[in-house]
């Protein structure tokens, strides 16, 4: 009997493939692992629950006793320090790359009294040259932690910046530290006092070989609308109608470049500057006499958002310790469904043609 095999170049259809698969499974079910490996190790995958003889037997237990020596460490892959051929996308310089919001307790000097230890959120970034793949971000944290036990000032931040610029071989760098700073504030008339918390950030920037020391402060105050105040008084005087002017909680964010050659600009100094410019700071502890006093204080200092920006500006211009600055104010209207906002800048540091779309949305008080 002569057998005429089918043309092996013929493309099988699905039924032919299913038949061949069934044949392989029947054969593999009775074959040894050696026979399967000799034919093709992948055939073993056709068997349900069959161990794959070509797959390594890996441990699933965490090796608690394993230790890393210098030789092992040297052999670990380091993709971020790889060749430029590994770069994905455009080979372009990155101005800022690093880590944001790593937190630790930091000790700060006060103008008077003992130092304070405050939970601090740190952001550290460096520039990345066009031909470099990436950075080892943990080095930023390690460099910062070398100084974490010191009482912080701009001088200590500079030392930390020097360390991680050296460790990461970068030419530009930035450190920003955010924290909530408490100050005990006395009530207007009752003699009570309580802690007011101020959102403060210290920022040190090295760019093009020059360093800038920047302090940011959020100041929360009450703004009484001058127009609403006059309209309310008109209703009272002309028609005997009781009316209430609208006022609202408002926030100003002051960002100032600190003159490194001048005397120290304390946190308390910048807070006092804000209070001189706009004295209607929100209160902490109040009794009835304090609430009445606050109403009188607001009536004596009605203020549009334009006024706020210029009043802060006047105080900032008068302080020789302050260079360039920016004032961003937001009056969160009780009359309108929208906010009234203003931005005033002095000098080139904060001048920009574009604003962050979320800038004004960040100006709110967290109780």
Curated annotation (Swiss-Prot):
Its EC number is 3.5.4.16. One of its GO terms (biological process) is tetrahydrofolate biosynthetic process. Pfam families: GCHY-1. Keywords: Hydrolase. It is an enzyme of class 3 (hydrolase). The keyword Hydrolase applies. GO terms for molecular function: GTP cyclohydrolase I activity. Pathway: Cofactor biosynthesis; 7,8-dihydroneopterin triphosphate biosynthesis; 7,8-dihydroneopterin triphosphate from GTP: step 1/1. It comes from the Bacteria. The record marks 225 as: May be catalytically important. InterPro entries: GTP_cyclohydrolase_FolE2, GTP_cyclohydrolase_FolE2/MptA. It catalyses: GTP + H2O = 7,8-dihydroneopterin 3'-triphosphate + formate + H(+). Belongs to the GTP cyclohydrolase IV family. PANTHER family: GTP CYCLOHYDROLASE MPTA. Converts GTP to 7,8-dihydroneopterin triphosphate. This is GTP cyclohydrolase FolE2. It comes from Ruegeria pomeroyi (strain ATCC 700808 / DSM 15171 / DSS-3) (Silicibacter pomeroyi).
């Amino acid at each position: 009997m002569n057998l005429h095999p089918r043309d092996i170049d013929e493309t099988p259809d699905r039924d032919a493939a299913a038949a061949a698969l069934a044949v392989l499974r029947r054969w593999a079910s009775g074959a040894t692992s050696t026979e399967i490996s000799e034919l093709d190790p992948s055939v073993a995958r056709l068997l349900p629950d069959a161990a794959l003889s070509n797959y390594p037997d890996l441990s699933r237990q965490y090796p608690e006793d394993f230790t890393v020596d210098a030789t092992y460490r040297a052999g670990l892959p380091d993709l971020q320090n790889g060749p430029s051929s590994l770069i994905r996308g455009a080979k372009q310089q990155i101005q800022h790359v690093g880590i944001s919001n790593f937190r630790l307790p930091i000790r700060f000097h006060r103008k008077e009294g003992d130092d304070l230890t405050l939970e601090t959120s740190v952001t550290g970034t460096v520039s990345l040259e066009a031909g470099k793949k990436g950075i080892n971000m943990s080095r930023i944290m390690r460099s910062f932690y070398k100084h974490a036990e010191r009482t912080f000032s701009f001088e200590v931040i500079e030392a930390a910046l020097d360390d991680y610029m050296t460790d990461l071989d970068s030419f530009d760098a930035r450190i920003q530290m955010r924290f909530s700073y408490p100050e005990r504030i006395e009530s207007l008339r009752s003699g009570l006092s309580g802690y007011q918390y101020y959102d403060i950030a210290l920022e040190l920037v090295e760019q093009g070989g020059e360093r800038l020391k920047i302090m940011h402060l959020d100041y929360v105050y009450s703004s009484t609308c001058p127009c609403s105040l006059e309209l309310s008084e008109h209703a009272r005087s002309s028609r005997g109608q009781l009316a209430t002017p609208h006022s609202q909680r408002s926030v100003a964010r002051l960002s100032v470049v600190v003159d490194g050659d001048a005397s120290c600009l304390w946190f308390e100094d910048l807070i006092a500057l804000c209070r001189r410019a706009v004295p209607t700071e929100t209160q902490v502890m109040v009794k009835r006499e304090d609430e009445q006093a606050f109403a009188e204080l607001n009536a004596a200092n009605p203020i549009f958002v334009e006024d706020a920006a210029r009043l802060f500006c006047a105080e900032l211009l008068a302080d020789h310790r302050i260079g360039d600055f920016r004032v961003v104010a937001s009056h969160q209207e009780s009359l309108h469904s929208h906010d009234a906002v203003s931005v005033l800048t002095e000098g080139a540091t904060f001048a920009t043609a574009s604003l962050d779309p979320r800038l004004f949305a960040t100006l709110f008080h967290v109780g």
